[in-house]
Amino acid sequence: MVESNQAARAKFDRLLRPRSIALVGASATPGSFGESVLANLKNAGFGGELHLVNPKRPVIQGQACLGSIEELPSGVDCAVLAVPGAAVVASIRACASKGVGSAIVFSAGFAETGKEGAAAQNELTGIAEEHGMILDGPNCLGIVNYMDGIPLTFVVTPPQPKAGIAGAAILSQSGALAAVVGVNMRHYSIPLTYSISTGNEAVCGVEDFLEHLIGDGVTRVFALVVEQFRQPKRFMELAHRARRAGQFLVLLHPGRSKAARESAATHTGAIAGDYDAMHTLVTHAGVIHVESMEELVDVTQILVRSHQLPRAGSAIFTESGAFKALALDLCDRVDLNLPALSPQAERALREALPAFIPPSNPLDLTAQGLVDPDLYRRTLPAVLDEDRFGSVVLCIILTDPKTTRLKLPPIVDAISALQPRKPVLFAALDEGAPFDFPELEQLRALGVACFPSPERAMRALARVTSFALGGDNRDSNPIVSQELQNLRAGLLSEYESKQILTQMGIAIPQGRLVSNADEGVRVAKEIGFPVVLKAQSANLPHKSDAGGVILGIHSESELLQGWTGLHCSVQNAHPGLALDGVLVERMGAKGLELIVGGRNDPQWGPVLLIGSGGVLAEAIKDVRLLPPDLTRAAIEQELNQLRCGALLRGFRGSPALDIGAVADVVLRVGRLMRSMPEITEIEINPLVVYENGSGAAALDALISVAEHT
């Protein structure tokens, strides 16, 4: 909605950092919105102008009230509307006429309820846009500016110390989850800069607030709860911008299941997009996508506290031999790499440990920490100094408070003395044990993220490590041939589709489109038997099902016989269908069959698909979704992640296949999709890949083109 410029920034500041506030619907009734907002502002010591509006009460809590919005002075920065939904539109109109710069609307009953509510919300949008007013909501819990102590919400908000330069901002469409996530973050002493509940986003959405806060100098992590993306492509652009600014985006996006997407649409009044496409593209844009509120808090905690990202595997220290085995299973499950000790690290640990503790990763220190206070200071450098370790997790038993008070101070002393730059995490093995020891707060102050369980710690660490190792792997060349700029709209035939692939440099079998059997014989003799015949029509996408494909033709007589049979089969399946012709192609050599596809998601844009291909593609479902702008090297890595990746690399004596040629095809399909948004779908199935150095060929292909607008 709002462009990123100085004027826009000033507008948003009137909402996020108001110097004057009008509380419309101020109240003395305990628990009411108007009373709760007023209590928050007084408890926070808000020092700006505060105007109370209540036509029925001349005084509230010793402060005089105005009888109406019309009595406000002109140019108030922000109006907080604690009024019923039926009064909201008139209140916003009155605020606009008084030059109020921004407003927060708590009331529900707008677009999330149906046509009438949507019409009322559209009226709100029109008034705000006409008068240049910034508006948060409706159907939201408001905004808390922790940096300046301005809680514009009815949720009880205790003041907190300023976050400094490494805080987290909560941006959530859901007001309830904004409040819950905030409580959970404060429980783990995560410093907060802002908590913003956007609700129905009639005027300002998550993207607007995100754009305003990128580069703010105080927010290191954006913890996002987004039920529906209204501007997906803009969101991805902002994600790239935030990453360049050294800020991190952690996203919780409900909607993996169909039922969840429908529920979210009902809740927010927006249309659900494709979840898998979203995950693929936002991850590529540099967003850490999590699956639960716990993960949202846990990943945020690591990013806020760590001096640097974990760019390698992890070392685990524990006090239990049994947990050592459990840790190996857990790390395998969450895909957290546990490198073996190097000879140097093993030697250093042998020197630091008593003889009965063998060096390993995970390292079982037994109960030695109780009798050897210097143990952690001696052992931690062995892994912190190794490049193969990007992080350390201390898994400590807290069951017995007496022994815990003996163990924790030496750990604090070790971290304080070593001042590690790499992330060090603390995880209690016993989630039911007390978790309020003062030493844990000391560890947090030293940059150690503390967790109530190893699973939460390691799952979050795996997310952050995967993100850190991702890097920028975007292909920067989207340009394709100008000859492709005028494509026919609709579903293209295989022959037409292959002509486009040829212009993109993708290999296809030798062949030609013919209109009669004699011409077919001439072409077959030119390219050499064996050949294949394929019926061609945009109205016949599944030609094999209609008998429109004849394979393995080795002679002129077989071709003539096949020609007749093909036409009879197609007419039986689709009476009256006129073919564009028959494609005569040289029979492709056998190889591994893959599928390479792409589709233009209406919300997110192009996304690619790779996987096992051929007639069993849908049954096997060995596929991966990719962004359309990966580099060749990144595509090869993705191909190796497929179940058929072992066949590409060479399996049980079979030769390695030309994975580089497949990556080239995927790269070119991605460039085509990015350059030509009118292409809605591409499918190459099968793409046959041959031995290394022998390339890959598209044996069948279909392209769909949108109607020109």
Predicted regions and their residues:
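Catalytic-core regions of core metabolic enzymes
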Residues: 1-709
